[in-house]
């Protein structure tokens, strides 16, 4: 019977090994620095990663250098990476193949044992962070005695919590004991949960993650010279952020308490990795290195064996791979060049569109409205946003001037005559949009792409009055436009390949992820959300308390409850969305009279002066409450799960998107569906809903961990 180490080693048969290349560098003050360069032999498209074979080789290399240090042959050891990369962390393709908790624990132990050799080398050790340092890549640096960073390094981070695991090669213990608890909370928890935010080199220096920063022109030479100063005793390294007795006695616990409350309100209790990471950071206050590392071993073993890490990896692959090769997209060489953009409307949404198009495409953008005052206000709003970007250092002054000059406004549609792309941002009413496009078509060329931002109307019907409906496409953004990464690109029956290709290429130029959908009610995101919100409102209107609804939906792990989501999108908008879906599918979607009453009332939740919810508004509860038999939270949860499984199954059967993966990609990018749920379909498989209503799962094999237990389907 093979041991856990044997099984871990077996995973390395096809690993892209990052090798450890050693060369001796004479130090200016005398002596030798052994420089280890990590390099996987691939180009910049494949960052160096740390799989089992890589760790074994690095460990053997460091053992050899320790022996040389003991013999007086080297006076310092440093590790750096190939151009642009230190290391991008663990080889996630290998981690996701781990077959058991024991093997996961062995991987954590191997990481600790290997990287820990930098702490036990017998001479000063350095890591020269010459580029990207993520996860295990940063943990290499944390194990060393000293760290330098290249000011051009792309990113520095511990993103593990974002992926459903924790820093488990020393990061959760070493970092708080190096930079203090507040900085560690930012790097380990806050940044990953803010859509995987990373540190710039200057930020890492300010936090104390690294000791000194050098420019890229002579980074290696400067780092070696600095290391020589440290070894020779000329350079003193200050560590002002290392926690002292007062921080450990008072500040540490207070910061953990604040973080715990923040997690409860922003993340909830479903996602495991943030809470496990918080426990590790809390324990790092009093534990020694060995105890802290052992706790990391157990934490990684638990999380890798569970479902959430595997769901996270599924979602990660969707965003990193599938989103870059959209299903159903025509060849990119069919796309027309977009050299000028017209935006119909001058309100807030139109301004967001114009700002995005001018900033990303760097082409003239014209907004239009029937009222000159609204046009002027819209242009000023856009230009003001551009100037703010310059003030924040996001763009240069020269670029700001160029962008401002590219934005103009008009009340005359004839100014769209030479536009290659026209998008509308007008009221969500069929007749209004039909009239807009009929008027636009009269002045633009036959090849101009017409794009509608409709969220619920039929694109085909919007184009009913067009002479050339083949150049109309749905281009549905999500709010806020600058932040949300998804665009649903809607192919109506008449939309031709050149138009669709132009839409997909334009979305990519806007730095958005585009998913091709058929012209069906709600497309993907709104149809799924309409099902969820409709079931929530139906439950309340038939006797179930709203508190029960929130308990029922909590296991979905969504960033907000159904009622919070309704307030966010707007109660009137929510009522319209439910009405639209009920009209299309009256037997499956609830038309909520209670929601219309709430829209007139204006709110669902009772909030304090800072906008924090205190509970349900009593009048709102009365307005939406109805008679009937109250469901328990478990009963309602099962009803919603089965309803979602049924609706998504119908969407796939009807060809709204190509595959379940596209549904999940839309929900992750457009609705904030948690990575650790993997979107909707892996969750619906895990709880048995897909088998109950469809007789088969969405995924075969299921997206689950090695310790997954099949639910009962009774």
Task: Place the predicted regions along the sequence by residue.
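Glycine- (often His-adjacent) and acidic-residue-rich active-site loop
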Residues: 45, 80-113, 133, 162-165
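Gly/Ser-rich catalytic serine loop of serine hydrolases
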Residues: 127-137, 196
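Conserved CoA-thioester-binding segment of acyl-CoA-metabolizing enzymes
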Residues: 2-80, 116
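Conserved catalytic cysteine-centered active-site region
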Residues: 114-127
């Amino acid at each position: 019977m093979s041991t856990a180490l044997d099984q871990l080693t077996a995973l390395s048969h096809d690993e892209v090994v990052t090798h450890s290349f050693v060369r001796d560098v004479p130090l200016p003050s005398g002596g030798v620095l052994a420089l280890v360069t990590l390099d996987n032999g691939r180009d910049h498209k494949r960052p160096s990663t740390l799989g089992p074979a890589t760790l074994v080789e690095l460990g053997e290399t460091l053992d050899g250098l320790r022996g040389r240090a003991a013999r007086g042959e080297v006076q310092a050891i440093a590790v750096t990476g190939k151009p642009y990369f230190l290391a991008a962390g663990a080889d996630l393709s290998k981690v996701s193949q781990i077959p058991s908790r024991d093997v996961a624990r062995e991987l954590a132990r191997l990481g600790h044992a290997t990287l820990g050799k930098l702490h036990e080398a017998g001479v000063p050790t350095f890591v020269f962070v010459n580029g990207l340092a993520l996860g295990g890549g940063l943990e290499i640096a944390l194990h060393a005695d000293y760290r330098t960073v290249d000011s051009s390094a792309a990113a520095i981070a511990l993103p593990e919590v974002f992926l459903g695991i924790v820093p488990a090669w020393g990061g959760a213990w070493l970092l708080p004991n190096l930079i203090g608890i507040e900085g560690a909370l930012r790097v380990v928890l806050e940044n990953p949960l803010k859509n995987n935010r990373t540190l710039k080199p200057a930020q890492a220096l300010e936090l104390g993650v690294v000791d000194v920063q050098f420019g890229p022109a002579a980074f290696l030479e400067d780092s070696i010279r600095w290391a020589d100063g440290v070894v020779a005793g000329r350079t003193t390294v200050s560590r002002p952020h290392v926690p002292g007795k007062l921080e450990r006695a008072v500040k540490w616990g207070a910061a953990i308490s604040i973080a715990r409350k923040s997690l409860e309100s922003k993340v909830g209790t479903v996602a495991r990795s943030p809470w496990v990471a918080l426990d590790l950071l809390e324990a790092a206050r009093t534990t020694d290195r060995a105890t802290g590392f052992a706790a990391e071993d157990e934490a990684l073993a638990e999380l890798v064996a569970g479902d959430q890490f595997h769901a996270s990896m599924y979602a990660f692959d969707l965003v990193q791979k599938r989103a870059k090769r959209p299903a159903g997209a025509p060849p990119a060489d069919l796309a027309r060049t977009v050299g000028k953009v017209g935006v119909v409307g001058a309100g807030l949404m139109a301004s967001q569109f114009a700002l995005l198009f001018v900033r990303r495409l760097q082409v003239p953008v014209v907004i239009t409205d029937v009222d000159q005052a609204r046009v002027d206000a819209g242009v000023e709003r856009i230009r003001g946003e551009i100037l703010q970007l310059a003030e924040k250092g996001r763009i240069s002054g020269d670029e700001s001037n160029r962008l401002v000059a590219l934005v103009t406004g008009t009340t005359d549609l004839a100014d769209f005559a030479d536009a290659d792309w026209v998008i509308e941002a007008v009221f969500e009413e069929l007749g209004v949009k039909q009239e807009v496009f009929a008027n636009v078509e009269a002045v633009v060329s036959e090849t101009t792409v017409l794009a509608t931002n409709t969220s619920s109307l039929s694109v085909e019907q919007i184009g009913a009055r067009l002479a050339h409906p083949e150049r109309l496409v749905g281009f549905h953004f999500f709010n806020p436009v600058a932040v949300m990464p998804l665009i649903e690109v809607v192919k109506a029956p008449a939309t031709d390949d050149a138009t669709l290709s132009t839409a997909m290429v334009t979305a990519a130029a806007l730095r958005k992820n585009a998913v091709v959908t058929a012209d069906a009610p709600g497309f993907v995101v709104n149809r799924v959300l309409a099902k969820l919100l409709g079931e929530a409102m139906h439950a309340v209107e038939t006797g179930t308390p709203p508190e029960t609804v929130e308990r029922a939906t909590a296991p979905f792990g969504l960033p907000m409850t159904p009622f919070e989501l309704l307030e966010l999108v707007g109660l009137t908008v929510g009522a319209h969305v439910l009405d639209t879906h009920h009209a299309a599918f009256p037997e499956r979607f609830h038309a909520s009279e209670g929601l219309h009453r709430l829209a007139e009332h204006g709110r669902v939740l009772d909030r304090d002066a800072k906008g924090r919810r205190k509970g349900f508004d009593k009048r709102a509860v009365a307005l939406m409450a109805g008679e009937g038999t109250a469901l328990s939270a478990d009963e309602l949860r099962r009803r919603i799960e089965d309803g979602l499984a049924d609706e998504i199954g119908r969407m796939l059967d009807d060809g709204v998107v190509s595959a379940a993966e596209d549904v999940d990609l839309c929900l992750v990018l457009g609705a904030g569906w948690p990575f650790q749920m993997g979107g909707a379909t892996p969750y619906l498989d895990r709880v048995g809903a897909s088998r109950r209503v469809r007789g088969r799962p969405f995924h075969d094999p299921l997206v689950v961990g090695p310790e997954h237990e099949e639910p009962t389907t009774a």
